[in-house]
Amino acid sequence: SEMCIRDRFNILPLKSHQSISSIMPMPENETDLKNYQIIFATAQGKVRKNSLEDFSSINASGKIAMKLDNNDKIVGVKICQDAQDIILSTKFGKCIRFEAKKLRVFKGRSSKGIKGIELAPNDQIVSLSVIDNDKTKKNGKKSKDDKSEIKAKEKFVLSISENGYGKKTSHIDYRVTNRGGKGIIGIVNSPRNGNITSSFPVFEGDEILISTNKGRVIRVAVKEIRTAGRNTQGVRIIKLSGEEKVVSAIKIDDNLL
């Protein structure tokens, strides 16, 4: 299905150089805040984790969440717990997955964070994702029972490019490594595909919304998108016209509808 967006309105008093990077729900019970952390990711590859309690009280004009370099910006903010993994994806198709618990909790909000991924020249992070970890390993090997358990809770990492191509790949193919490395190929960044605009975890039964720079929005069922390995280009998901480009893609959250 498809629709166009023509009107917009302000929900926050933003300055001309500011824009919203993330919107997310908070736990309803404030006593639950201590059980969660909040992780920030910047375009230049920095990450920082704070206790969610650090942001329990925010006034109407907002508060400074993270100190940034002049050429940097926040591209993703997620709530996470120690039993989860972090995935950073870049516009050139690279990605890295590391354990959330191995990222230390920062005190205060004045730090620039630490390196999440080593970026190639002119590359930048476009997506921050959080997924449950696969803690079933024993002595570094996976038994048949381990593999069955992981397969039962399998998710897919969906990647979408600016030229309307994309694919989904099993999260099992994204190995856990140490933070700060160069990462692995998540999707091939080819002239046909263009740069990657979005990458995030989905289940087979989910649906996504894809938006273009011409104000067009299309709704797609994840099951209609081909499953492929990491080192592939994917297939056409949305047909674009002229100078039209995909600018974002998000998973539809049924709990918010």
Tell where the protein language model's regions lie, with residue ranges.
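A structural feature that tracks compact, well-ordered secondary-structure segments
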Residues: Q37-F55, M66, V77-C80, D85-F106, ...
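Conserved catalytic alpha/beta cores of large enzymes that bind or transform nucleotide phosphates
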Residues: R6-T42, I125
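Short, small-residue-biased leader/transition segments that mark boundaries at the very start
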Residues: S1-I5
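Beta-propeller and closely related beta-pinwheel folds
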Residues: N10-M24, S56-D82, L119, I184-S190
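A short acidic-Thr-Gly-centered motif at the start of a beta-strand
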Residues: P25-L33, K78-C80, K147-K151
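Short, surface-exposed linear segments at secondary-structure transitions and domain or protein termini
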Residues: F9-H17, N59-K63, R104-K112, T177-K182, ...
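Intrinsic, low-complexity N-terminal interaction/targeting segments
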Residues: Q124-E149, H171-P201, I250-L257
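Repeat-based blade/solenoid architectures
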Residues: L14-S22, A83, S111-K112, E118-L128, ...
